[in-house]
């Protein structure tokens, strides 16, 4: 609600538009919250603002100046957490901890407090000014640190020279119960918040943990520098990596079992940086893997084209897009629909993200010479019906894949290109002859992922910029025939306004008209123009349809797709 607070106060005639603008200038100048800026500029009294917030959030309001919080209560919340989330614990009530917050809708803060304290969290609202004053007052002498929560792991763990490191001590610290508890907290919190990646990042004077949620990075924690090596070592031990090797990148995998028997995999990448090892973990939740093609977000005609292309006994189907655009999900859904007792499927992947019964999956190992090209050559002696190559990276892999597609095999793979027509140019630039490209390709699919508007709180847009719609590519005659929605923010979406992502597809069957253009040396722009004439919807066109259907916003479409220019 923070972004709309000023507008709500104006609407309730508690402040004027001029006062809001003055406060916004103060906010931009000093980086404070809008509520604090309004109080500082004299637009509204602190007590009136707190009462207003209480009504908006539906929670009681308190004046922290009237409270004398017991030290035992203060110790429950580390100073770092109090300052990060602007919270102050005020009392206990049975299994619940009552916490004063200036933004009770901050689900991240509530979750962190619940994890760290073990209490159910009941929120009350207080102004930011009073919370900052309370933090300064209660934590002035010696506030509790996060180390008090996770325990002391020993001063000798932090070292300055690699040659003096004690590996036995590092391993021991990594297995200490407090460190194990903190690492488990990070992993479980990422699962609960539906993160796709966890970043554990060391810097010269700082150490932070960030989650990527719906494609956007969010900071969630700043553990003490003292625990940096212990946390990294714990993650490396869980991933069966060598904790004594800190100069080279390492890759591994973590598998954990949660309540109810559910298992979760984490793909782990460790990379040495200037101030220590950075750990990135990709969450691999097979239960959330969508393998039903009809539920991936295809429109009816593109879905029919895609199904027809993968149902052919031979030829090549390519899925393109940047990292994190959902290519693996699309390929896995295709393999799932093709997997049967009468089919031999071989895949070369780097890495293998999910295991599938009935599919022969091979993990690449470049260090011993097992790359995509080597795996492909081996597959051709394995009597395959369908071959999936994780990525076409070079001429050798492309050449073998094309030849396999021309000799009775269905080949599925990915490339990193901006759109479907651009994939043809990439293959030609790799050195594949035009006649081989036209003879082997069945279909090219380009895709992106845009954030989906939260269905629980999205609302019709009050002000629609018609010129912005036209500039984005919406036909003028379509303006006013659909309802545009805008993000709001609620507990369901952690006050972000978005929840999950929606796929945007550009499906280009390799029609005869396109083959003729390729043979004649046409450019990617000419290919795209002809494909659209033949019925293809570009990424921008598909994205705008998702917007007109109310699934996402114009900002997401424009940010994830390029305009169609010929």
Swiss-Prot record:
Domain notes: The ATP-binding site is essential for assembly of pili.
Coiled-coil residue windows: none
This protein's encoding gene: pilB
UniProt function note: ATPase component of the type IV pilus (T4P) that plays a role in surface and host cell adhesion, colonization, biofilm maturation, virulence, and twitching, a form of surface-associated motility facilitated by cycles of extension, adhesion, and retraction of T4P fibers. Acts as a molecular motor to provide the energy that is required for biogenesis of the pilus and the extrusion of substrates generated in the cytoplasm. PilB ATPase activity is also essential for T4P extension while antagonist PilT ATPase activity is required for T4P retraction.
Protein name, entry field: Type IV pilus assembly ATPase PilB
GO molecular function annotation: ATP binding; ATP hydrolysis activity; metal ion binding
The keyword Metal-binding belongs to this UniProt entry's keyword annotation: yes
GO CC term (a single one): plasma membrane
Residues annotated for Zn(2+) binding in this entry: 454, 457, 490, 493
Superkingdom of the source species: Bacteria
One GO process term, biological-process aspect: pilus assembly
Binding site for ATP: 321-328
Membership in a protein family: Belongs to the GSP E family.
PROSITE patterns named among the record's database cross-references: T2SP_E (PS00662)
SMART domains: AAA
Keywords: ATP-binding, Cytoplasm, Metal-binding, Nucleotide-binding, Zinc
């Amino acid at each position: 609600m923070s972004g709309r607070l000023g507008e709500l106060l104006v609407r309730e005639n508690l402040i004027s538009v001029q006062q809001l603008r003055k406060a916004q200038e103060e906010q931009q100048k000093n980086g404070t919250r809008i509520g604090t800026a309004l109080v500082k500029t004299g637009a509204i009294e602190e007590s009136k603002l707190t009462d207003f917030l209480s009504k908006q959030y539906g929670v009681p309001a308190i004046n922290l100046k009237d409270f004398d919080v017991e030290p035992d209560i203060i110790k429950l919340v580390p100073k770092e957490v109090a300052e990060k989330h602007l919270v102050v614990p005020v009392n206990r009530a049975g299994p619940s901890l009552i916490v004063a917050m200036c933004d009770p809708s901050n689900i991240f803060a509530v979750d962190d407090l619940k994890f760290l304290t073990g209490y159910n969290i009941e929120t009350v609202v207080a102004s930011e000014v009073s919370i900052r004053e309370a933090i300064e007052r209660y934590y002035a002498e010696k506030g509790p640190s996060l180390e008090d929560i996770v325990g002391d792991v020993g001063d000798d763990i932090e070292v300055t020279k690699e040659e003096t490191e004690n590996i036995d001590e590092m391993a021991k610290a990594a297995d200490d119960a407090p460190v194990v508890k903190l690492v488990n907290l990070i992993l479980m919190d990422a699962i609960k918040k539906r993160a796709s990646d966890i970043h554990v990042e060391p810097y010269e004077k700082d150490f932070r943990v960030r989650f990527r949620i719906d494609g956007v990075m969010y900071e969630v924690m700043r553990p003490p520098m003292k625990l940096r090596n212990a946390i990294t070592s714990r993650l490396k031990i869980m991933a069966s990596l060598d904790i004594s090797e800190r100069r080279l990148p390492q890759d591994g995998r973590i598998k954990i079992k949660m309540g109810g028997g559910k298992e979760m995999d984490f793909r782990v990448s460790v990379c040495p940086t200037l101030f220590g090892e950075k750990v990135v973990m990709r969450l691999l939740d097979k239960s959330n893997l969508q393998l039903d093609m009809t539920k991936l977000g295809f429109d009816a005609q593109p879905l029919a084209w895609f199904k027809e292309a993968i149902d052919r006994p031979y030829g090549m189907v390519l899925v393109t897009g940047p990292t994190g655009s959902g290519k693996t999900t699309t390929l896995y859904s295709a393999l799932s629909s093709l997997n049967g007792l009468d089919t031999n499927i071989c895949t070369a992947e780097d890495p293998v993200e999910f295991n599938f019964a009935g599919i022969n999956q091979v993990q690449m190992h470049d260090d011993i010479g097992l790359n995509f090209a080597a795996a492909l050559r081996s597959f051709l002696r394995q009597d395959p019906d369908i071959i999936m190559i994780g990525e076409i990276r070079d001429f050798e892999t492309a050449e073998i894949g094309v030849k396999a597609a021309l000799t009775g095999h269905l080949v599925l793979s990915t490339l990193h290109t901006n759109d479907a027509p651009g994939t043809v140019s990439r293959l030609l630039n790799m050195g594949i002859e035009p006649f081989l490209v036209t003879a082997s390709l069945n279909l090219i699919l380009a895709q992106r992922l845009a954030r989906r508007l939260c269905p629980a709180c999205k609302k019709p847009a009050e002000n629609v910029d018609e010129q912005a719609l036209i500039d984005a590519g919406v036909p003028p005659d379509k303006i006013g025939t659909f309802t545009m929605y805008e993000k709001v923010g609620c507990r369901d979406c952690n006050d972000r306004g978005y929840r999950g992502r929606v796929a945007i597809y550009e499906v280009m069957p390799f029609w005869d008209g396109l083959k003729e253009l390729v043979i004649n040396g046409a450019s990617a722009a000419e290919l795209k123009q002809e494909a659209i004439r033949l019925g293809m919807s570009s990424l921008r066109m598909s994205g705008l349809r998702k917007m007109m259907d109310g699934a996402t916003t114009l900002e997401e479409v424009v940010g994830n797709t390029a305009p169609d220019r010929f």
